Amino acid sequence: MTVSPVALRRKTECKPHPTARYWKKCDVEALFGLPFLELVYQAAEVHRQNFNPREIQLSTLLSIKTGGCPEDCAYCPQSAHHNTNLGKEQMMDVDEIVEKAKIAKSRGASRFCMGAAWRGPKPKDVETVSAIIKAVKGLGMETCGTFGMLEEGMAEDLKEAGLDYYNHNLDTDPDRYNDIIHTRRHEDRMDTLGKVRNAGLKVCCGGIVGMNETRAERAGLIASLANLDPQPESVPINRLVKVEGTPLADAEDLDWTEFVRTVSVARITMPQSYVRLSAGRSNMPEAMQAMCFMAGANSIFYGDKLLTTGNPDEDGDRILMEKLNLYPLQFEPEGEVAEVEKASGIKADY
């Protein structure tokens, strides 16, 4: 059965698991309005009911094709519409990508995420990334791809190649979507999410805060994510990285407590999803990150670069995790890869 964009929106009577519900925007905004420590406490309780609170999923994100994107996303330095001095590059060589994945695994990452600056891939691009996915899967890692909007059959091809997750963010509140992006619609995002779900892929879907939105608009973003049916397996929460030359370079700074509130509300409304601290973490003090982990964040991007912007270095993350008595979630490979690891005794070194 085809999953249509409308079918992805959760209905009040549609409850695929006991903790799912339909979230009205006003109800999500009410959560945002709780006293700060009460909200964090509630989120921490929900988190402990669904996850080991000491486990953190480590993912590495690599830009395999950088710059020259035809989309005009106001936050993105890779857009060809913005003067950010970021040139258009060709896709990385397959062997180079696989070598990056090997390094990521040796340093503790269990998931390897690949991004390409496309509006959407061409059929020949899908063939190329499928070969990359197969090679990375052969290392015993989970794979995630973010390649833009997909045409019919592409999600199935990626699934057949071994892709585990497809990232396709909803970016912001649907009501202000075209204030941020003019070259596509919110409905276009929903269409690709429908194709991804129909192919049997897991969904990584989140958004960006700190783009001059109101609290009510942050609530709208979280409600739109929580009402996806089923809810995303991974929810990246990005804090805007302001890049000179983009329309949002002078955006007002988002108060750190408001970011923690966003993480908390995401955890409460999406109790079984991995909530990932994504872009903007390099500007977050350790205490702020610790509060986010308390509030239910249980995944980070690991490595000193996220596509084109900075990220905390690996040594710093190791030290922080040791301070907080956290440890990395290990991905358990299946099939032939699992047998090889079992026989060799080789595991990720963390």
From Swiss-Prot:
Q: What are the GO BP annotations of this UniProt entry?
A: biotin biosynthetic process
PROSITE patterns cross-referenced by the UniProt entry: RADICAL_SAM (PS51918)
Q: Could you tell me which residue ranges the Radical SAM core domain spans?
A: 54-278
The record ties this protein, via InterPro entries, to: Aldolase_TIM (IPR013785), BATS_dom (IPR010722), Biotin_synth/BioAB (IPR002684), Biotin_synthase (IPR024177), Elp3/MiaA/NifB-like_rSAM (IPR006638), rSAM (IPR007197)
Under SUPFAM superfamilies, the record lists: Radical SAM enzymes
Q: How does it assemble?
A: Homodimer.
The name of this protein is Biotin synthase
Record lineage: Bacteria, Pseudomonadati, Pseudomonadota, Betaproteobacteria, Neisseriales
Q: Which gene encodes it?
A: bioB
